[in-house]
């Protein structure tokens, strides 16, 4: 996909770098697989902000994605690739031999007209989905389940890829991009290849308004606030005179907050430190 740097015809265009995808479908999405999406503005049912920096943005409709890929043995043909405003990856509309259509995360290299297959006997080819116990060690995969039958949870964003490095007993060991080594049940499914649109990270927004189109609001520094609004607020100058904390007083910058001890034994090696 070409990277296009805009000419500085205005202040808002000067620093814009766009990723152009000429292969994407230019019409409407497939209507039976589209749902209404209600924006929360970062508020919960009491109207209180529970997620900061969220609000506004262009109206979006949710595309129902098939993360389970459970149509075993039924070949599907990729009809088209589409843009999805709800995720960084592109999606593919697949027409199966039984007449059903489903959206799936588009793998890198898959084009309109390609055939996709799921099941234990599917060939090892980009876009096909198999249980990890049927995938050769060393294969790069994406859209990986963490519980058999639950649907893909890992490696779903643009350019994501995970390597299957070992298989022992009922578990398979995966190497994530972060450097973390993690075990998952060998019956969990994964899709061969990596996720499409790896150039997604090369986009430069060029102006604040481009972030607002996505529903992302400004991030204000705590030290620029008043004491009533943030532990870093107030005082003379920019020094807040204490260890940095979140707006709720929890230490930040290295303080561990992970609570899920239940799955600690599945992590073989922690992710690389930056």
From Swiss-Prot:
The keyword rRNA-binding applies. Keywords: Ribonucleoprotein, Ribosomal protein, RNA-binding, rRNA-binding. GO terms for cellular component: large ribosomal subunit. One of its GO terms (molecular function) is structural constituent of ribosome. Disulfide bonds: none annotated. It holds the Pfam family Ribosomal_L2. Residues 221-256 are annotated as: Disordered. It comes from the Bacteria. One of its GO terms (biological process) is cytoplasmic translation. The keyword rRNA-binding applies. One of the primary rRNA binding proteins. Required for association of the 30S and 50S subunits to form the 70S ribosome, for tRNA binding and peptide bond formation. It has been suggested to have peptidyltransferase activity; this is somewhat controversial. Makes several contacts with the 16S rRNA in the 70S ribosome. Part of the 50S ribosomal subunit. Forms a bridge to the 30S subunit in the 70S ribosome. Belongs to the universal ribosomal protein uL2 family. This is Large ribosomal subunit protein uL2.
């Amino acid at each position: 996909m070409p990277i296009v740097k805009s000419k500085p015809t205005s202040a808002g265009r000067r620093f814009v770098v766009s990723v152009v995808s000429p292969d994407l479908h230019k019409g409407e999405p497939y209507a039976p697989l589209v749902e209404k999406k209600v924006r929360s503005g970062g508020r919960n049912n009491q109207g209180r902000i529970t997620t900061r920096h969220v609000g506004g943005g262009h109206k979006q409709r949710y595309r129902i994605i098939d993360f389970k890929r459970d149509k075993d043995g039924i070949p599907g043909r990729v009809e088209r690739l589409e843009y999805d405003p709800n995720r960084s990856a592109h999606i593919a509309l697949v027409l199966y031999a039984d007449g059903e259509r489903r959206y799936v995360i588009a793998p890198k290299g898959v084009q309109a007209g390609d055939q996709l297959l799921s099941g234990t006997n599917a060939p090892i080819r980009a876009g096909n989905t198999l249980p990890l116990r049927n995938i050769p060690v060393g294969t790069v995969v994406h859209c990986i389940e963490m519980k058999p039958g639950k649907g893909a949870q890992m490696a779903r964003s643009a350019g994501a890829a995970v390597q299957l490095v070992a298989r022992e007993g009922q578990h398979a060991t995966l190497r994530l991009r972060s450097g973390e080594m993690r075990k998952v049940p060998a019956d969990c499914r994964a899709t061969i290849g990596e996720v499409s649109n790896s150039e997604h990270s090369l986009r430069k927004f060029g102006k604040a308004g481009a972030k607002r189109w996505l529903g992302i609001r400004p991030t204000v520094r705590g030290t620029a606030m008043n004491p009533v609004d943030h532990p870093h607020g107030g005082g003379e100058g920019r020094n807040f005179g204490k260890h940095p904390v979140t707006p709720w007083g929890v230490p930040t910058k290295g303080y561990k907050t992970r609570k899920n001890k239940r799955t600690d034994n599945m992590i073989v090696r922690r992710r690389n430190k930056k």
